[in-house]
């Protein structure tokens, strides 16, 4: 696999994590470096670790991943997105997204939900005899860059949305969950 192919793969894998980063950022009024690092590092680490797990689990784990990955991602993202929408609708006008809290637990769940596909990619990488450490390093770096860019862009527009930012962010998460589910159920992938 060439570097160009690997970067394109990494960009594809990072899209869900970037979209979730946008969703999170829409509910943070003043993004600090701490927020950027928390999100970008968490998503990058999981996008890198999951292919490694898939690579070494390869054949024995492939059927389990393919049968359940879309359900897990769908359920987690719909619950988190639904909670964000509910909190935004029921919040006072002054609160905007103030009920949103970027916790380690939330980021962990989001990182797992958005990196399940990367686990399956790891299975595929094992069949290609690629240098897995090099591959996961590229995937992690690209995910970090994409998430950082997404966070900065979303924060710029999030302040303009006010209370609706939480609703938009929640809808993004629900949309990603539905996309993953539909893609796996009806299009095999």
Curated annotation (Swiss-Prot):
It is a multi-pass membrane protein. It holds the Pfam family Mntp. Keywords: Cell membrane, Ion transport, Manganese, Membrane, Transmembrane, Transmembrane helix, Transport. The keyword Calcium does not apply. The chain crosses the membrane at residues 2-22, 36-56, 71-91, 106-126, 132-152, 167-187. Its main location: membrane. InterPro entries: Mntp/YtaF (IPR003810), Put_MntP (IPR022929). The keyword Membrane applies. It is found in: Cell membrane. GO terms for molecular function: manganese ion transmembrane transporter activity. One of its GO terms (cellular component) is plasma membrane. It comes from the Bacteria. HAMAP family: MntP_pump (MF_01521). Belongs to the MntP (TC 9.B.29) family. Probably functions as a manganese efflux pump. This is Putative manganese efflux pump MntP. It comes from Ruminiclostridium cellulolyticum (strain ATCC 35319 / DSM 5812 / JCM 6584 / H10). The gene is mntP.
């Amino acid at each position: 696999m060439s570097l160009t192919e690997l970067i394109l793969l990494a960009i594809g894998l990072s899209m869900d994590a970037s979209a979730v980063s946008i969703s999170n950022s829409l509910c943070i009024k003043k993004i600090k470096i701490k927020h950027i690092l928390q999100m970008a590092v968490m998503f990058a680490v999981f996008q890198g670790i999951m292919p490694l797990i898939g690579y070494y689990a390869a054949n024995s784990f492939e059927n389990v991943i393919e049968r359940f990955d879309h359900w897990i991602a769908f359920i987690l993202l719909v619950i988190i997105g639904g909670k964000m929408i509910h909190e935004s609708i029921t919040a006072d006008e002054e609160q905007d997204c103030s009920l949103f809290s970027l916790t380690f637990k939330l980021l962990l769940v989001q990182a797992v939900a958005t990196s399940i596909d990367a686990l399956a990619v790891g299975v595929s990488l094992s069949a290609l005899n690629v240098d897995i450490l090099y591959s996961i390093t590229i995937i992690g770096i690209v995910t970090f860059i994409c998430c950082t860019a997404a966070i900065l862009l979303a924060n710029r527009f999030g302040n303009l949305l006010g209370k609706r930012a939480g609703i938009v962010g929640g809808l993004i998460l629900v949309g990603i969950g539905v996309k993953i589910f539909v893609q796996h159920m009806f299009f095999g992938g």
